[in-house]
Amino acid sequence: MKIFHAILLIVTGTALAADLPRSPAPAGARATIISPLDGATVSSPVTVQFGLRGMGVAPAGIAMANTGHHHLLVDADLPPLDQPVPADEQHLHFGKGQTEAVVTLAPGKHRLQLLLADHLHLPHDPPVVSQPITITVRQE
């Protein structure tokens, strides 16, 4: 019976999330990774600076037009855009309105991309994303 309830909760939650309206983004709004630069070789931990044009930054839970908060995708493709951004080691949330983060990464190549989301962690419509960058973390 517990398994049935767990499955029901997952199915219902996914269906409800898919029904949430996405916040509109102004035309031309875009996220950028200011630093590190694409192709950079860096040491870990890595300081990642977030940029945003055409919108403002607001903490998660604060519903204000034309604002959102950053999510840093690490070695991950864009998640489904009609659902809240997952919270795991590949989808880092910055729900306090941070515009910079210090991220510990293993040595090797890594792909980073920013995705802005609204107060409910839903990506905007159209999505506000950065171009992905690739960095190499050197072995120390």
Report each predicted region and the residues it spans.
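Short amphipathic, basic-aromatic surface patches that mediate peripheral association
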Residues: G51-I62, L122
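Contiguous beta-strand segments within globular domains
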Residues: A40-M55
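A glycine-anchored, Pro-Gly-centered beta-turn/N-cap motif
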Residues: S44, G68, A106-G108
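Short acidic/polar inter-strand loop motif in beta-rich domains
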Residues: P79-L81, A117-V128
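Short, well-structured beta-strand segments within conserved domains
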Residues: V46-F50, T99, G108-L116
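Short beta-strand elements
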Residues: P126-E140
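Short, compositionally biased P/S/T/A/G/V-rich stretches that sit at domain boundaries
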Residues: D19-S43
